[in-house]
Design a protein with these regions (language model features):
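Active-site beta-loop-alpha junctions enriched in small/polar residues
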Residues: 66-72, 91-92, 112-114, 132-136, ...
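Secondary-structure transition/capping motifs at alpha-helix termini
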Residues: 102-105, 147-150, 203-206, 238-246, ...
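Charged (often Lys/Glu-rich) extended helix/loop segments that serve as interaction or gating elements
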Residues: 282-284, 288-292, 296-455
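A generic local secondary-structure boundary/capping motif
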Residues: 119, 141-147, 185, 199, ...
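Structured core elements
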Residues: 85, 108, 128-130, 154-156, ...
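Active-site loop/helix belt of alpha/beta enzymes
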Residues: 1-3, 162-319, 414-416
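Short clusters of hydrophobic/aromatic residues that line enzyme substrate/ligand-binding pockets
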Residues: 9-11, 17, 186, 372, ...
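A charged N-terminal "starter" segment
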Residues: 1-131, 137-153, 202-207, 385, ...
Length: 455
């Protein structure tokens, strides 16, 4: 390929966008638009690359894909084949992971308000539960007694991260990382974690395994992850000193960003996102130093990357409709995709780089500024002030890096059906999510018979 957007997505000698061995134009013709397209081999490449980066620096590392980024069972099967576990949030993601054959020993269940059905399924299956409150600790113990099987549990810590009180977040704007992280609903402060551990150690129905924390993506500054590791290890040392219990594993969650030079993420600021090696070096070096400092041995390190693994595995193909120009050279290019399909554009001012599928590496002289807009009854700006080659009705535009939080967040505003998803492996292209129909969109509605009567 004459230009690469990722290892398996790029531009061929004709200037066409290709996903592995398939021309994006052919995929749009064969499967219709809008269309999510995923590269199987890019998924495999990413898992292997991040695993290699971490294990080269800290061999006892387990990769748990954050399923909320892309919970398609076909995608989950690929992660299984590559040896990755999974982080699940709620009954649906847990059920899909187990349905896809994920090793329960590599699955974690998260959530701040877990219900009995999902907790019971986790206990029965041997999935580890990240406890979010003292109340949940007792609830899980009772459910385990009813099931007749010990439940594996980790307390979810609510770290203070005071070192980050003066560090400005990239997103959301105007927030410092430390106070912002402390303001969310997840996890327990130290005294509750201590009491949770006491109760778990005293219970015949709870198997206390490790500690869990997830800070999320606030900044591309690697100091965020160093601070999480330092404080998580310090909490582990305090628990050892007070209880005589040492965590067998430390889960530091996700929050690993991903970016490209053309831009990605909130306000396009993930151009500066660290790569896998930079993340691994920062986390592993800090972890090794802190473990040695406190004499905590070598627990299993668990990380939960989502977007960092799934963003660049996919594109969203969309077809051009009306092209409208306003006097003064303002041009709107209407496409059949919308913010329904990439809702982070609306909620986080997310930037997805866009290319013309038939001219994906244009000469600068061919470019003009346009707004790419969708069909919804909102402004529905998919990409403002984008430099694109000339576009006309029927052309195909591709939004890059849509493999994470596209399909999983897609909505049906304006009663718009959601796209299909196709998985490409070499020359092969297979539907892994069927295109929604209008019948699917309206099928749950019910009109009481009395409202059908005239008058």
């Amino acid at each position: 390929m004459r230009r690469q957007f990722s290892e398996y997505i790029g531009v061929d000698e004709h200037g066409h966008l290709r996903i592995e061995a398939r021309d994006a134009l052919d995929l749009a013709d064969a499967f219709g638009t809008p269309l999510f397209v995923l590269s199987e081999n890019q998924i495999r490449h990413n898992v292997r690359a991040i695993t290699r980066a971490f294990r080269a620096r800290y061999p006892r590392t387990e990769i748990l894909f954050s399923n909320k980024a892309n919970n398609n069972p076909a995608v989950r099967r690929i992660f299984n084949q590559e040896g990755a576990g999974g982080d699940c949030f709620g009954y649906g993601e847990l059920y899909l992971s187990l349905l896809a054959g994920t090793d329960p020993g590599k699955v974690l269940l998260n959530g701040s308000n877990k219900q009995a059905p999902e907790l019971t399924l986790a206990i029965e299956s041997g999935v580890t539960i990240n406890l979010d409150s003292l109340e949940e600790t007792d609830q899980v113990a009772e459910l385990a007694r009813q099931v007749g099987r010990r439940a594996k549990v980790n307390p979810r810590t609510r770290l203070m991260l005071s070192d980050l009180d003066d560090v400005a977040a990239d997103w959301p704007r105007g927030v410092a990382v430390g106070p912002g992280a402390r303001a969310h609903k997840f996890g327990m402060h130290y005294e509750d974690v201590l009491e949770t551990c006491r109760r778990a150690l005293a219970s015949e129905w709870l198997d206390l395994v490790g500690l869990h924390h997830h800070v999320g993506r606030w900044t591309n500054d690697l100091g965020l992850h160093r601070a999480v590791v330092r404080e998580q290890v310090a909490w582990a040392a305090r628990l050892r000193d007070e209880l005589g219990w040492t965590p067998a594993h430390l889960d530091i969650g996700g929050g690993l960003a991903w970016g490209r030079p053309e831009g990605h993420g909130p306000d396009a600021n993930d151009r500066s996102a660290p790569d896998y090696d930079a993340y691994a070096e920062a986390i592993a070096a800090t972890l090794s130093d802190e473990l040695q400092r406190y004499g905590l041995g070598e627990p299993l390190l668990m990380i939960e990357p989502g977007r960092a693994l799934a963003s660049n595995i996919g594109v969203l193909l969309t077809r051009v409709g009306t092209v409208k120009t306003w006097p003064g050279n303002k041009t709107w290019v209407n496409v059949d995709a919308s913010q329904n399909h990439l809702p982070n554009i609306l909620t986080a001012n997310w930037y997805y780089h866009a290319v013309a599928a038939a001219n994906a590496d244009p000469h600068p002289a061919e470019l003009g500024e346009v707004d790419l807009v969708g069909p919804l009854c909102t402004f529905d700006v998919m990409g403002a002030a984008r430099c694109m080659p000339a576009l006309r009705r029927g052309d195909v535009v591709a939004f890059l890096d849509t493999g994470a939080y596209g399909e999983t967040k897609a909505a049906t505003f304006n009663a718009q059906p959601r796209p299909a998803t196709v998985l490409v492996s070499g020359e092969r292209a297979e539907v892994i999510t069927e295109r929604e129909t209008l019948r699917d969109v309206i099928g749950r509605y019910r009109v009481p018979p009395r409202l059908l009567l005239d008058g």
